[in-house]
Swiss-Prot record:
This is Arginine--tRNA ligase. GO terms for biological process: arginyl-tRNA aminoacylation. Belongs to the class-I aminoacyl-tRNA synthetase family. The gene is argS. It is found in: Cytoplasm. It comes from Blochmanniella floridana. Its main location: cytoplasm. GO terms for molecular function: arginine-tRNA ligase activity; ATP binding. A motif ('HIGH' region) lies at residues 123-133. Monomer. It is an enzyme of class 6 (ligase). One of its GO terms (cellular component) is cytoplasm. Its EC number is 6.1.1.19. Gene3D superfamilies: Arginyl tRNA synthetase N-terminal domain, HUPs, Isoleucyl-tRNA Synthetase, Domain 1.
Amino acid sequence: MNIQYLLLQRVHEALTLINTKSFLNLIQVQQSNHIRFGDYQINGMINISKHLQIPIKDFSNIFIKTINLKGIAKIIKFEPPGFINIFLSPTWIENKINHIIDLPKLGIDLIPSKNIVIDYSSPNIAKEMHVGHLRSTIIGDSIARILSFLGHNVIRSNHIGDWGTQFGMLIAYIKKHKINYLSLNDSQQISMLEYYYQESKKEYDSDPNFAELSRKYVVKLQKGDVYCRKIWKYLVDISISNNQKIYDRLNVTLKKKDIMGESMYHDMLPYIITDLKNKKLAVTSDHATIVFLNQNKNSKKNNPFGVIIQKKDGGYLYSTTDIACIKYRCETLHADRIIYYIDSRQKQHLMQAWEIAYQAGYITKAVVFEHHVCGMLLDKNKKPFKTRSGNTIKLITLLNEAFNKAYNLILNKNLNLEYKKINHLAHIISIGAIKYSELSKNRTTNYIFNWDKILNFDGNTAPYIQYAYTRISSIFKKINHRSELQEKKYQIFLSSQEEILLAICLLQFHETLITVADRGTPHILCGYLYKLSTLFSLFYEHCPILKTECTYTKYSRLKLSFITAQILKKGLNLLGIETSEYM
């Protein structure tokens, strides 16, 4: 049930009837911000009236008389300076809310399926995941869940940094210092691996001979040297195993099969170089291979911007890998849409790779490319979120601290729960709190991380919404005839303003998901779930459920509660957040 789309169709029909079809793109239908402006609002009428040179009130009256919302709207009225407010009919709302309780997927219709590649998380190998990976991982995973739920074929792509200079440095360091890397036990592996990386980076920056040796090992690795490949595989396997533990704990759907790292495209690179040369897109300059882009000119000299795709020593660059990656996703995976959740600093680099791929004919203009920029995680001083010593906070450290805080919070509430249940609840609350704190903010903005706020049971937080679900679950634990909810004789009827507002919000779940899927902005879903939880709280406060004397009223309100619980649970699930029957 997509009310917004239904109303937009009726708007288009009306504009066609009054010969203003050419102005369709000027009109928007959106949910009203306040109940006094109705349930929905049509915006943009003032733009059409200006084009037609007709007073806005006169044009709006013509439109209101033309639009067919019979049975859907109770009131349609003009609101200065140029809005049309729509108040939905309670009878129509009753009919629709009674219909969705019997439908699969909460009444959400599947849309035409597309192949959508989502590039997210993408940590570098040889390092532990840190808080900087959190937004890409969590937001990307939520969008993958939502698009899958709507019926798309989603291809998750974890484009890990498993190739390149850092491996030349590590191999050179292990060789130089005669490190027996195979002797490390499981608990030492990832921390020692990161230590080796840090030390090798110091030598790389300070010792020209070590830097040259590192570059030689990169080339040997790329050419398939057995010794280099053995070390490389061991290092990659350690990192992948460690990252998977983080993903599992975060309830992120990424698995080993979703890894499409830089190394995957290595065998394509010689062809890419040759093909770009044959198509006169790449040239040799000072023994390196370069593609010049007219669209990206050097601002000082107004010369075409050069993108190096192969170095003098024969080594390849990230740009070469990205071109091959785009080619693979379009020609092999047949992507219709490709979404990148990666660092905003990569934007220019991505645009260059896309442009080269377009010019080479690897992709068509029909493929939609989107770089969904993510803001930064800040501390209370609005500085990048780091340890007191200035180091980046490890993701495992953040998760452990969140668990401990949630555990103590539960104990302080004096819940009469056994140890196993407290642990389970602390896990659900802590992971939910961290994920929701990321997802509830507009992904394009920086935000301040605050422990007290994210673990609060009031306000727009995961614990508040999780508790709303738990409260509804507790209602159904008190009744013995849950099967009677399915009986047709018990219909939902809306006798109060609280019930009407709750029912409308329930019917808006579908259009909310469509908006989030189109824009890649899960904070809109978070806002919806918070609004739904708040409206249920008002309904619960003003409309007795189990204590009402009328059986029909009781089951009407139980059905509203049941649908609310289903949507809260599904909505949180689409954010990658679990619920609990107790709290």
